[in-house]
Amino acid sequence: MKSTAAAPLFQPCSSARAAIQRLCDHLNEAFESTAPAGDSPLRSSDAAFAQRVRSALAEAIADPGLLDESACKGDAHGYRRHLLAADAHGRYAIAALVWMPGQASPVHAHHTWCGYAVVEGKLTESLYRWDEAGACATACRTQPRAAGAVSVTRAGHAAIHRLANESGRRAVSLHVYGVAGAQIATHVNDLVRVAESGVESSIGAISSGLNRDGQTVAPDVVAQTPVREAALT
Ligand SMILES: [Fe+2]
């Protein structure tokens, strides 16, 4: 498939625009230089492709001009997503997520491959194991993700996580999802039931504020929960 420049979805400054375009170029190369896995287009088990995406994210966040202030604005009601670019062929979408202190995602698996890198501040990633018999997720471990951390995740219940900003200052992360730009809020997250009663009750408390992919539909409801989980990662 011939490379096509992804259309910018907002108006970044020139240095940010150039950095985002370089990231798009690298992602295009990743698609065109690696053979699809058997489950294409999910590419859940395509190690060469995942390594290409990981390298593209690492190089992108090393550029101090990647995100201008317009892409780093937060929201007091829940973490905010800024859609930066979308592939003209619908193969991927790129977003910056801004996490104010105390904000977190729901516990979720993914309908597609995705990757993220921490650009600013520090996130905490909680990892979960899927219990097929119980149809629920159990917490395994928690890992700090400081600026510079890069992760690429496969689709499916083999990779379930939750991201949170447990620090006292803003955090910003860069995400790429294997969906078209128009699907970023509806076809990425796969919300799962959590086994632990405490966490499960927290998820349940916000369920009325989220659609099936964790997209916020009633921010004021989400804001009332003890842990402000919203949107998607
Ligand atoms: Fe995620």
What are these regions (language model features)?
Residues M1-P64:
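N-terminal leader/capping segments at the start of a protein or of a new domain
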Residues C72-P101:
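A short glycine-rich, His/Asp/Glu-containing loop-to-beta-strand
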Residues A95-A109, G156-A158:
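Conserved short histidine dyad/triad with adjacent acidic residue
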Residues H110-Y128:
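Glycine- and acidic-residue-biased ligand/ion/polar-headgroup-sensing regions
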Residues G115, W130-I160:
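Short acidic-glycine-tyrosine-enriched beta hairpin
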Residues G115-A117, G168-Q183:
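A short hydrophobic beta-strand segment most commonly corresponding to one strand
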Residues A149, A155-V176:
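Ligand-binding loop in jelly-roll beta-barrel domains
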Residues L191-T233:
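Long hydrophobic alpha-helical segments typical of transmembrane helices together
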